[in-house]
Amino acid sequence: MPRSLKKGPFVDGHLIKKVDVQNEAGTKNVIKTWSRRSMIVPAMLGHTIAVHNGKIHVPVFVTESMVGHKLGEFSPTRTFRGHVKDDRKSKRR
């Protein structure tokens, strides 16, 4: 169930403050965050945000098509190593 439109998007306060400070200064430094639940808003366009995936911070460059999604969607938490190869020759013996 999506968030109500009358509430507006959720962005952690500390994250939006860091983005606003960089927008005013005109800098585009990497912003580290653990807030995977924050929604990407238009103020974040062009910034690189390093989102924590539980182990490391994954850099995410925010583009226009990402607006409305959450930061955690672009930082995968699980590593897929692939399925085990089906070795039929060894099963015959």
UniProtKB/Swiss-Prot annotation:
Key word Hydrolase present: no
Ranges annotated as biased composition (Basic and acidic residues): 83-93
UniProt record, GO biological process: ribosomal small subunit assembly; translation
SUPFAM superfamilies xrefs: Ribosomal protein S19
Molecular function in Gene Ontology: rRNA binding; structural constituent of ribosome
Record keywords, A-Z: Ribonucleoprotein, Ribosomal protein, RNA-binding, rRNA-binding
Cited PROSITE patterns: RIBOSOMAL_S19
KW Ribonucleoprotein (keyword) present: yes
Superkingdom per UniProt: Bacteria
Start and end residues of each stretch annotated as Disordered: 74-93
Any one annotated GO CC term: cytoplasm
PANTHER family per the UniProt record, alphabetical: RIBOSOMAL PROTEIN S19P FAMILY MEMBER, SMALL RIBOSOMAL SUBUNIT PROTEIN US19M
Stated family: Belongs to the universal ribosomal protein uS19 family.
Function, as annotated: Protein S19 forms a complex with S13 that binds strongly to the 16S ribosomal RNA.
Name of the protein in question: Small ribosomal subunit protein uS19
Source species: Streptomyces griseus subsp. griseus (strain JCM 4626 / CBS 651.72 / NBRC 13350 / KCC S-0626 / ISP 5235)
Gene name of this polypeptide: rpsS
